[in-house]
Amino acid sequence: MQSITIRNTVIGEGLPKIIVPLMAAGEKELLEEIEAVNRLRPDIIEWRADVYEHVDSLDAVKDMLEMLRKAAGATPLLFTFRTHKEGGNKVIDDRFYIELLKTAIETKHIDLADVELFTGEAEVKLIVKTAEDNGVYVVMSNHDFHQTPKKEEIISRLRNMQAYGAHIPKIAVMPQSTEDVFVLLDATHTMKTQYADRPIITMSMAGTGLISRLAGEVFGSACTFGAGKEASAPGQIPVEELRSVLSILNKHM
């Protein structure tokens, strides 16, 4: 598996990289939040644009990205609009979703862009091409907030992301039992050892799945999400606690 270096962050080697989301709705609050997040020393900062109150305006998004880029400094910036059907905050038209992603990418203020696998093959390939033309990496994602698919289905989705050109495939699933967490971890390990030629991100959500957010280095997930001011998904824990556990595991492996 090849690692990816974005600015000074190497994804796919050593400790899983910590991604911290920005979840504020307003401009002033976002700028205050990113300053607080910077103090946590994340490896990557994610802007959850589906929470932004002016996300319907492409000009407002471009202006906000310029400010966030400046505030993030040397820390890689991930742009994410999580659709409502995959757990996001806002319902938007599919065509606007694609236009929003293209606009964010073409500002060149971001380092990574999240695009959901089930947007459609042609659409995600268009986003991948746009990203590559602008020096941006693609995190291709899928989120199931209701269940954990079978191991074979999890692997199939990750392999499809890889085939569609994702630089970093990502899947998050909801466990209904401890056994479901084992399924996700087993699928992650199999994907990493048998199929992946690039970093992957996987997680089992909620408290039941917490171990998957902590043991990525063991099973093969290259990044994990920690809560800054506010968690963006069930099961995220504060960054300082997360970093401590990741460091302990890394030290004794």
Curated annotation (Swiss-Prot):
Keywords: Amino-acid biosynthesis, Aromatic amino acid biosynthesis, Lyase, Schiff base. Pfam families: DHquinase_I (PF01487). GO terms for molecular function: 3-dehydroquinate dehydratase activity. Pathway: Metabolic intermediate biosynthesis; chorismate biosynthesis; chorismate from D-erythrose 4-phosphate and phosphoenolpyruvate: step 3/7. 3-dehydroquinate binds at residues 46-48, 82, 213, 232, 236. PROSITE patterns: DEHYDROQUINASE_I. The active site is at 143 (proton donor/acceptor), 170 (schiff-base intermediate with substrate). The keyword Amino-acid biosynthesis applies. Its EC number is 4.2.1.10. It catalyses: 3-dehydroquinate = 3-dehydroshikimate + H2O. It is an enzyme of class 4 (lyase). One of its GO terms (biological process) is amino acid biosynthetic process. Belongs to the type-I 3-dehydroquinase family. Homodimer. Involved in the third step of the chorismate pathway, which leads to the biosynthesis of aromatic amino acids. Catalyzes the cis-dehydration of 3-dehydroquinate (DHQ) and introduces the first double bond of the aromatic ring to yield 3-dehydroshikimate. This is 3-dehydroquinate dehydratase. It comes from Bacillus velezensis (strain DSM 23117 / BGSC 10A6 / LMG 26770 / FZB42) (Bacillus amyloliquefaciens subsp. plantarum). The lineage of its organism: Bacteria, Bacillati, Bacillota, Bacilli, Bacillales.
